Amino acid sequence: MSRETAIANAERYFDEGGYKADLSRRVAMKTESQNPDRGPELAEYLTGEMVPTLEKLGFTCRILHHPRAKGPFLIAERIEDPKATTVFGYGHGDVIRGLEPQWREGLSPWALVEDGERWYGRGTADNKGQHSINIGALAAVLKARGKLGFNAKYLIEMGEETGSPGLREVCEANKALFKADVLIASDGPRLSAERPTLFLGSRGAFNFDLEIDARPGGHHSGNWGGLISNPGLQLAHAIACIAGPTGQIRVPEWVPAELPASVRRALADCEVDGGSDGPQIEPEWGEPGLTPSERVFGWSSFEVLAYRTGNPDNPVNAIPPKAWARCQLRFVVGVDPANILPALRRHLDRHGFPMVKLAASREEIFHATRLDPEHPWVNFAVDSLKRTTNAKPAVLPNLGGSLPNDIFSDVLGLPTVWVPHSYPSCSQHAPNEHILPAIAREGLRLMAGLYWDIGEKGAPRS
């Protein structure tokens, strides 16, 4: 009974095909939460797949529902000693739409396909592959020790890809059931494929629409050009006053007052790397005076996700009556999400664009969160991962993307430590989503070591 035995068990689970078999079965389940017809599949992932898996590990399981949720929730718990440390785990079994016609020839979103150093399939990276690693690591520790040495609770939701509707309410209504000492979970990418990573929160995400509706229909550009406004041109200028030509945000309330010293220290040795097939980082893009890692992990960013005016598929010589854009602000701690649209309204009005209508494009907002990089649980996890790999992991104060971490940190009051098992070029929301088996195997080793250390040492002292 040793740490090395637990890690060897995790390696064997991978090497003998257990992990691949489990993930293949889970990828084949078409759990598209953005598809209203997939309700039965969302439920079956929990009742037919997760419940039997966790019950074999000694967990008691219950299914929870909420009227706002796209699918059910599973809460599983294994209580070994009420006085022991309790670790809260999280994952989501839903995926985005499969986008079947867009996948490369020979691939399918609903089949795990091995091709070279990649395993393809929807959910391999986000998030079936990741929570499968953590559950496999729990099993490896149980096999080695006969117990975990701590209490474990695991929440799996089926609506994360639609903004986790109902998750906040379920957590608020079940605080006693969900009570724990720390959240340890996995989602998102590492800093790079080669470097194990911890992140301690996430940027917030707010999606909204800009629209100009000038008149009922289009008018001939020869007869009316120079006489009536062009909404497409006006909206382009409105967007240009929101962010400069290199992406620098011009709405003061959308950026933090400062980059905290502890965040800057944590990011000092973090080099952003998208891998050989990722896009080239453009050094002049974004907030001036910040490093690439500070721009994506320490600052806000504004994006235009879609833009429409006229008839792009069949342009005609007419001044369009309308223009529309779907935009997004990724924001960090220090930006008030309730002030995002009011601040933009004031900004556009000051710059002469009162005709631009604003509307949030989805009800749910992912709020920004960030655990102090020098928190005792962070130091504990860093030491554990370093012990397993003999190398210091990257520590990101928050993920560049967004996830419902604020529910765990603010509603449940948990310190949050995430250990991602994907990498930046995994195509997680695109065709050809994949996981790197080398990272999956290392992830099993890392998590088995981390769970072993928690069972051996308990919660770190403040």
List the predicted regions and their residue ranges.
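Acidic/His- and Gly-rich active-site-bordering loop/insert found
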Residues: 2-124, 143-150, 327
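Generic secondary-structure signature for well-ordered alpha-helical cores
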Residues: 28, 55, 143-146, 175-176, ...
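An extended, acidic, His-containing surface patch that forms the Zn2+-binding/catalytic region
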Residues: 59, 82-84, 192-193, 248-314, ...
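Alpha-helical metal-binding/catalytic segments enriched in His/Glu/Asp
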Residues: 89, 113-163, 208-212, 224-246, ...
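Acidic/histidine-rich catalytic neighborhood of metal-dependent amide-processing enzymes
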Residues: 123-201, 459-462
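Flexible glycine/proline-rich, aromatic-decorated loop/lid segments
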Residues: 197-213, 417-422
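A short glycine-threonine-serine/GTX helix/turn-capping micro-motif
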Residues: 219-228, 313-316
